[in-house]
């Protein structure tokens, strides 16, 4: 890349930086990006850059691969049904240990090393994420969000800290739940009136043709997104991600994005370039 191209990229980013300065962007961090050191470090730098130029990033994370690793170390077989982890009490204890004690702190340390200031919390802190059992309870301690209490986030964001939130909620009686991080991110984005919700995934975004990378839907709206589900253009694991975006938009989030976290700096490419890199859904 020559000097002229570098200047052009910075110039293209400027109006987006100005537009999103002071705005909250909720980012769900997960998938294979969490297992690749280069991708992890690029993500940490991206979050630091967003914060440095005045954007207010809030990171929600899961930790599936790391949870599975620890279950196997403890000679417990991970069990799934319809894509959801079967979570008994023993598994829940490990989920809490891994998400809050390992994954969360790794993200915090990674971002802090860049010179930015991240603070790690879980949905248990300040009753941030209230939850209940999902469905009929057949998945055990898998939960769904009933209420977000975002007050704990306000002083952190206002002082320039970057909240890093593990996707664990609890009932008012103190029963912890393992919750899908996509849906936690969507509900938090709605509760804090975020400008954007961004889901980092292992896919490009919404494809009109499943196996055709050239069929990426760069921009769509709520109605079309619902149609994609009804017409089975969106299938399998993309259904809950798209539904999560739809729900967030219906609650006032201005734009939701599904992007490929396997591409270095995909977060910046989506936010600060004209063409973006994934799928943007707007109301």
From Swiss-Prot:
Gene Ontology CC, one term: cytoplasm
Intracellular or extracellular location(s): Cytoplasm
Pathway(s): Amino-acid biosynthesis; L-arginine biosynthesis; N(2)-acetyl-L-ornithine from L-glutamate: step 2/4
Chemical reaction(s) catalysed: N-acetyl-L-glutamate + ATP = N-acetyl-L-glutamyl 5-phosphate + ADP
GO terms, biological process: arginine biosynthetic process via ornithine; L-arginine biosynthetic process
InterPro entries on file: AceGlu_kinase-like_sf (IPR036393), AcgluKinase_fam (IPR004662), ArgB (IPR037528), Asp/Glu/Uridylate_kinase (IPR001048), NAGK-C (IPR041727)
EC number(s) recorded for this UniProt protein: 2.7.2.8
Residues binding substrate, per UniProt: 63-64, 85, 178
GO molecular function: acetylglutamate kinase activity; ATP binding
Keyword entries, A-Z: Amino-acid biosynthesis, Arginine biosynthesis, ATP-binding, Cytoplasm, Kinase, Nucleotide-binding, Transferase
The keyword Cytoplasm is assigned to this record: yes
Keyword hit for Cell membrane: no
Domain of life (superkingdom): Bacteria
Site-annotated residues for Transition state stabilizer: 28, 241
Function (record text): Catalyzes the ATP-dependent phosphorylation of N-acetyl-L-glutamate.
Family as reported in the entry's similarity comment: Belongs to the acetylglutamate kinase family. ArgB subfamily.
PANTHER family: N-ACETYLGLUTAMATE SYNTHASE (PTHR23342), N-ACETYLGLUTAMATE SYNTHASE, MITOCHONDRIAL (PTHR23342:SF0)
Protein name in UniProt: Acetylglutamate kinase
Taxonomic source organism: Prochlorococcus marinus (strain AS9601)
């Amino acid at each position: 890349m020559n000097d002229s191209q570098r200047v052009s990229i910075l110039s293209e980013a400027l109006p987006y930086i100005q537009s999103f300065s002071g705005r909250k962007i909720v980012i769900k961090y997960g998938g294979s990006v969490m297992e690749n050191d280069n991708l992890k470090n690029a993500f940490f730098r991206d979050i630091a850059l967003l914060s440095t130029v005045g954007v207010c990033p809030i990171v929600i994370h899961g930790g599936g691969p790391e949870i599975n690793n620890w279950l196997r170390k403890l000679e417990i077989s991970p069990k799934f049904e319809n894509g959801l982890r079967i979570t008994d009490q023993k598994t829940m204890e490990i989920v809490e240990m891994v998400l809050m004690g390992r994954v969360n702190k790794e993200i915090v340390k990674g971002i802090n090393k860049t010179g930015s200031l991240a603070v790690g919390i879980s949905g248990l802190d300040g009753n941030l994420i209230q939850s209940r059992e999902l469905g009929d309870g057949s998945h055990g301690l898998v939960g769904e969000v009933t209420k977000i209490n975002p007050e704990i986030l306000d002083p952190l964001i206002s002082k320039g800290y970057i909240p890093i939130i593990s996707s664990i909620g609890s009932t008012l009686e103190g029963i912890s739940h393992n919750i899908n991080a996509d849906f936690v991110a969507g509900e938090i984005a709605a509760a804090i009136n975020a400008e954007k919700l961004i889901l980092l995934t292992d896919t490009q975004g919404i494809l009109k043709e499943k196996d055709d990378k050239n069929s990426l839907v760069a921009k769509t709206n709520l109605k079309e997104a619902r149609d994609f589900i009804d017409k089975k253009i969106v299938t399998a694991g993309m259904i809950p991600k798209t539904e999560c975006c739809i729900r967030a938009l219906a609650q006032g989030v201005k734009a939701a994005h599904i992007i490929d976290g396997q591409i270095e700096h995909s977060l910046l490419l989506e936010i600060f370039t004209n063409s973006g890199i994934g799928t943007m859904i707007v109301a």
